[in-house]
C-alpha cells in the first residue's frame, strides 16, 4: 500500500520552470518524443474493440488500455509494473500513459508545414525571397525550381515550367539540378547561409533609398536574425517526420448499435497514413513520375488538412458535410483549448439557484438553502462526523448524510459557522461580481441575497440565478474573509464612491421620513432629547413630518482626529430626529437635517466611511436599510391613476402649437418656405410645446396648497406619490412623468429621423391606434439595440482586459518627477469637473506654490486626500502637476506613487494590486449603459444658432490665455491668433469659466479687468472669417484686375459695392496664374513689414473673399480688410456611446481628420495641383520648409503669411490621436483621450476615475519606433518595447556608445494585446495561428510575467497574495535554493508583505 502511495506522490511531481520557450521541432526531436511508428491506418477492431497493432491506437506504441494489464492478458496486477509482455509487446503501466505517449509517421516525401507557408507574412517565402504564389507552384508540383544551376545560364531559385525544364535538359544535360515539391523547397532552405545573408542585408539596408525596399529588407533581416538567435534551422519548416497525438486526446468511443463516435483527427491521420503508404509502394515500384508526383501532392494536401483544415483550398469535410476539426481549430477561438479549457475552467464544490430578497440579513450574510449547503460542504461534514465518533468510516458518514439524520444538521451548522462562501452572478463585469458572504442556513430552495449588494451585482429578483462556490483551503478562506467579504467592498473600484448605497424602497422610506410638512400634528413643540421625540411619535402625539425643536448631543470628529462633543438645539422634524438615532457618533446632525434624496444618502455613506471608518459604516448602512424599509412601509406610498395630474394649460398649449403648425403648412403650400425649413420649424415648435407642457405639469405636481397654523393658505412641496418617487431618486424621472401626465412628444422613425406629428396624448389619457403604432418604432429599436450593445460591450471589456492584464503595482516609487498638468475641466463656460475632484487620490509630482509667492503649500509626493482637496480649493490653485500611470518609469508594472489611491480602499495602493484589470473592468462594466447610436445632428439639435459672442455667466476677473491681439483705435482688442481663450476667475483667483476666442473676435475688456455677470465681453461674426491688419497704412491692390481675378458686386438693398475674388476655375486664362493680394504701404509708398519680422505685409486673398476697402484707402490697426464667407459646416454625424469609446481605444484615424501644423513657422501657399492646394510652412529656425498637399474642399483656418505653432489646427475636423502624439507629445494625447472618453460616459451619468483611462493608455503607448539606431542592434523603423529600448540605451550609455533615438507610437488595444511580449497571452486573445507561428519561428521565450500566462500554466497569478509566492520563488532562484516553496514559507512571506504595506 505504502508503495502505491509513494508512486502516486511521484506522479504528482511538478516540473519547476520560469519560462516557456516555443520553437520548431527538428525531425530528431520528433523521433525522440515518439514511442513507435504508426504504420497502418487501422484504429480498433470493430468486433473485439481491441486496438489494432501498428495502427493509430496501437497498445504497443501508446500503452495498455486497462491499468496494469497487457493486451493479451498475460500480465495483470501491479506487481508486474514495467514489464514488457513478450507476446503482445505491451508495457504494463497505467492506462493514463495513453494521454502522454506520442508516436510518429515517417513521411515518404517531405511536406511543407502550412502555418509557415500560408500564415502571412509567409515565413518560407521571406527566407527564400520568393513570392507565395511561386512557392505554392513548386510545392503543389506545377513548376520546377532550380536548386543548383552549376555552370549554366540558369539562376538559383528560378522557376521552370515543364517545357522550359525539358528545353534546359536538352541544352545543358545534367549540369544543373532542378526539382519540384517540398524536397526542392527543403533543399533551398537548407542551402541558406544565415550568417552570410545577415551580413549582406546589414550592408545593403543603409545603401537603399526607397522606403518599401528598406521595409522588405529589414523584414527579411529580422527573420534571419530570429532564426540565427533561436537555434531553429530553416529546413525544419518542412516536415520529414510527422508527430502523432496520443490516442486518448483523440478518442474513439464505441456507441451502441455498432457505430463509433470519433474525433475528426483520426480521420485526418488516416488519410495521411493511407497516402503515405501508397506513396511508399509507388516509390518501391518506381512508378511513372506523373503518378508519384500526384501522390506526393495528395500527401502534402492531407498533411495540410491535418494541421490546419481549410487554410488552403476547400476544407476536407466528413460524412455529414461538416468541415473536419484540425489541430489548429482545436486551439483557436472561443471553443479552443486556450479560452475553453485553460482560461475558463469549471469549478467543483459549486451550485446555483434562483435568488430572492433577504431584507433581514446583515450585510456580510447570505441565505443558503440547507439542501445546497449539505451537498457543498459534504467532505467537511464527513470529516466532522468521523472526528466526533458519530460515524466510523467515510462510507457510514455518507449513509448518515444521505438519510439526513438530525445530528447531520447540527454538524452542518457547526461546519458552516464562519466558513465564507463566494456568490457570483453572471455576467461578472467587474470584481464586485464575486463577493464572499457568511452563509445562514434557510429552508426553501432559493438563495437569499442582501438588498444592498444588488447594485454591485446588478442583480434583481425577477428570476436571476447566482452561483455559490466554497473556498476549501485555509488560505482561500482567509482571502475570502479578508479581501472579498461584502463588508470590505463598500467603495466602487471605478470611482471611489460608495457602491453599497440604498436604492428604490429604502430611499423612498428615508426621503419620506425626512420631509417636512406645514401644520402637521405637534408642530412647534420643543423636546429635551431624541428619546422623548421617539416616545411622543410612538404615542401618536406628533406626526413624522412635524417641524420641531430638539436638543441634541452630537460628537464631531475634527480634522486632526480629535472628538468634540457639543450640545445644541436644532430646528428639525420628527423624522430626522428619529433618523439621527442610527447615525454613528462622529457625524454632525447637519448630515440628516435635510430631505434625504439618493444623492444625499450616497454622500452621507461616503462621509461616514471617510470619518468613522469601515466597521461603523457597514453597521450604519444596514441600519439605514432597515429604517428605510420600515418607513417606506409605514408611508404607504403607492401610485394611483389620480396621482398623474394633467395640467390645465395642456389643451391651450397644444391648441396654440397646432395653429402655428397650420400657419407654417399654409406658408409651405404657397411656396414661401421649403420642405426642409417647414420640417425643421414644425419639429422645433412641437419640442417647445412639449417642454412647456412638462414645465406646467411639474409645477403643478411639485407644489400643493395647505393651510398653516395661522389659517393662511401657503404652498409647500407636494406629497404626491409619483412626485416623491421621482424627487427622492427612488424610481422614475421627470421625463417619464412627462409621458404619464404631460404628453409623449415627438417620436423617431427607425432610421433616426423624427416624425413631424407628435403624440399629444399621455398614458393617463391613453393612446389612439395611430399614436400607439408610431410609438412601437422606438420600443422595438430599443430592444434590438440592447441585444447588440451587450455583445459589443463585452467584447470591448475583453480587449481592455487583455491589453492591461499584466499591469501590476510592483514598487512603491519609481522616482520620476514627470506628470500630467491637471486643470479644472471646463466646457462652454461651465466647470464640468473642478480641479479638486480631478486630483483627489493622486500624488503631487512637483511642489505647489501659493499663487503669487514662492511658498510651497503642497510638497511633491503628497497623496491628495479630501482634506488636501479643500486646502487646494481654499488657496484657489488652478493647476497642479500630478503623477500619472502614463509617465511611470517602472520597468515591469507600475509604481504606487504614480497610481495614487486605491479607489476601493481609500489609501495608497498596495504592491501587488492588479491595477490593469481593475482599470479595464471599470471602463468596460458601464459599457452596457452606453448607447449604440451615432447621433445625426438634424432637426432641433443642429440649429442651435452659431455662437457669435461671449457672455459671462458669473462676474469676476478677466484672464486671457495664449492670445495674440492688436489694439484698435477705439481701444478694443482684436484677436489675431486662433487658439486664444478667455477665462473668468472669481475673487479667489479660481477659474470659473473659459471660452475659446476665434480669429478676428473683438474683445471689449482687458486682462485683469472686473466684469459683471451677464456682460458681453467679445463678439464676432460666425458666418465670415475676417482678415485683420496688424499695422496702419495705405492699401494697395496687387493683381486684382476686374473680370480677370475679381468681380464687383453691388448690394441691391444698401447700394454698397463689394469686390469678390473669383475662384481659379471661374477665371479666364489670363487670370489663372495671378494671385490677388492686398499690400500695405506707408505714406511714401514703401512696403510695410509685419511687426517683428522681415516679411512684407501682404495679404493673399483666397477664392470668394469679399474686400470691403478701396484701393488707396487709409486704414488703422485691427481693421478688417477682407472677409471670407464660411459655409456653416455640413452636419456631421457624431459617433456617440460605445462605438466612440471603442474608436478611441483602438486609436483609429478618423475620416477627414483635422490637419495640424507639422512645424512652427510661416504659412504660404505654393503652386496648386489638380484638386489639391499646396501648403508650405517655412520654419522660423531657418530649416527646410515643410510641404503638404491638402484637398481643395478642406476649409483652412490660416492665411498666407500667418505664423503658426507646431500642432496648431490648420483645418478643422475630428482630431487624429496619432497626430496629437507626434506633434504635441504624450501629455496632450493623454488629455485629449481622457477628456473624449469621459465626455461619452458623463453623458450617461457614469463616473469613472481618469486614472483608469490613463492606465489603459499606458499600455497603448508601450511601443516605440526607432528613428536612429545608434550603436544598438535595433534597425531603423523597427517597433520595439519601450522598456527594451531603455535598457539597451542604458547599457550603451554605460559603454560610452551612441544610444538609439526613438519616437513613441500609439497602438490600438487589439494591436497592443497582440504585440505583447508574452506569446501565450497574445495567442489566447486573437489570431492564435499567426501569433504562434511568429513565436515559433523566432524561438520566443515567455517569462510568465503577466496574469494570463500564469493562469494558462496553472500557477498563482503574480498579483495580490500570489505576488508573495512569486517574489519568494524569485529570491530562491537568485540564491540557488531548491525552488519548491512550502506553505509555511509562503505564509511567512505573506505576513511580511501585509505588514510592510502599512495596513
Swiss-Prot record:
Binds 1 Mg(2+) ion per subunit. Gene3D superfamilies: 1.10.132.30, 1.10.150.390, 1.10.1790.20, 1.10.40.90, 2.40.40.20, 2.40.50.100, RNA polymerase II, clamp domain (4.10.860.120), RNA polymerase Rpb1, domain 3 (1.10.274.100). One of its GO terms (biological process) is DNA-templated transcription. It catalyses: RNA(n) + a ribonucleoside 5'-triphosphate = RNA(n+1) + diphosphate. Keywords: DNA-directed RNA polymerase, Magnesium, Metal-binding, Nucleotidyltransferase, Transcription, Transferase, Zinc. Mg(2+) binds at residues 460, 462, 464. Its cofactor is Mg(2+); Zn(2+). DNA-dependent RNA polymerase catalyzes the transcription of DNA into RNA using the four ribonucleoside triphosphates as substrates. Belongs to the RNA polymerase beta' chain family. This is DNA-directed RNA polymerase subunit beta'.
